[in-house]
Amino acid sequence: MATLRVDEIHKILRERIEQYNRKVGIENIGRVVQVGDGIARIIGLGEIMSGELVEFAEGTRGIALNLESKNVGIVLMGDGLMIQEGSFVKATGRIAQIPVSEAYLGRVINALAKPIDGKGEIIASESRLIESAAPSIISRRSVYEPLQTGLIAIDSMIPIGRGQRELIIGDRQTGKTAVATDTILNQKGQNVICVYVAIGQRASSVAQVVTTFHEEGAMEYTIVVAEMADSPATLQYLAPYTGAALAEYFMYRERHTLIIYDDLSKQAQAYRQMSLLLRRPPGREAYPGDVFYLHSRLLERAAKLNSLLGEGSMTALPIVETQSGDVSAYIPTNVISITDGQIFLSADLFNAGIRPAINVGISVSRVGSAAQIKAMKQVAGKSKLELAQFAELQAFAQFASALDKTSQNQLARGRRLRELLKQSQANPLPVEEQIATIYTGTRGYLDSLEIEQVNKFLDELRKHLKDTKPQFQEIISSSKTFTEQAEILLKEAIQEQLERFSLQQ
């Protein structure tokens, strides 16, 4: 019979006791009672916060949105196909946040800031909360710097300033995305960081936008956040906040940023889906009661910061889709009331070949001429009024048998003004060329031309002005004023081009 070696056992026990590392941690644990349709109901998790991240046993993450007396409603940040009833869930003690850094420029990412462009991982040392508080009133200053879109109709009559929120609204297939992407293309060389957020779009549409950015060299200063139509509702709901967090990172580093939300109608629909599955009471159009807060807390993050915070800015261009031109629906009226103006895109104008199809009469910018350079104010001051009078006269002329000479001249001038506002896609114009174009139309130099000739003449005029009168561009860009010398140079160029054009015909 073997004898017990007491001293050896004693030695082993002593070593084990010395090696024992006492770790006591309290974890907030719950159990899944129901899962499906992107929603999980959990019992337990007694100390959880609203909006806190949770982690399921198989690795999926979720956000706590409904805190009820008997259970917690979690929205899943993934398909959750492997989550089983009865499995454990752990609260992380953290609110949703994403990594942020300069390395995100030129990349395509999802709502969790993970790259989806196949170009490898993104290294980031800092992080920001996906939902952070908007700058206070004291932290802001009024909008005073223009953000040029490159579109004559907008920059001359519905100007957008850095730090403004301007809604782009219209039916489907009226060119809303084209207006937004052209604005991004026009920021090349302007030291503006752009963030394009695609919510619930077709993957082919997003790929087309990214290809355009690459071809035009815009990806160097742009981040694309994309959640496609087949993404979970939770990620479509989060995508705009992720984009805003990235834009804020640059804004608080004294940079100017532009963010496009394409489009907020899809985000509202994703939020409605989540809310109905969480059994929240539905309101108007089955949206939950806090759908206004969904958009207001997002758009209020756009701001022009004061000098103490570095005068950075975040300009937001949210897009909202209407059904058959109904701007009195719930989501359009909500976003109109939050933003500092709106650009209406009309299906009738689009089908009539007027592109961008901007209805200048009912579009408005509440910042107004504060967001224009002096030269643009001098030249384009009355153009919106002239176009409004033309539209009124045109409606009257349909029923009038004979018009007096003054009315006929006004109609002819209005048609030419409307023609000069036409621009092809991905062809934004610098502000100096816009000023030359508007001056030519409003001063009557186009009256002698046929309407079909207007755009050809203007293209040639802009090229002629650039080649033979480079001083014109220098005067406008340096002084921001339409001086007498600039006017003389422009008049000379117009006269020369009119003579050349008449000889060509």
UniProtKB/Swiss-Prot annotation:
The record marks 363 as: Required for activity. F-type ATPases have 2 components, CF(1) - the catalytic core - and CF(0) - the membrane proton channel. CF(1) has five subunits: alpha(3), beta(3), gamma(1), delta(1), epsilon(1). CF(0) has four main subunits: a, b, b' and c. It is found in: Plastid, Chloroplast thylakoid membrane. The keyword Transferase does not apply. Produces ATP from ADP in the presence of a proton gradient across the membrane. The alpha chain is a regulatory subunit. PANTHER family: ATP SYNTHASE SUBUNIT ALPHA, CHLOROPLASTIC, ATP SYNTHASE SUBUNIT ALPHA, MITOCHONDRIAL. This is ATP synthase subunit alpha, chloroplastic. The gene is atpA. It comes from Agrostis stolonifera (Creeping bentgrass). One of its GO terms (molecular function) is ADP binding. Its EC number is 7.1.2.2. It catalyses: ATP + H2O + 4 H(+)(in) = ADP + phosphate + 5 H(+)(out).
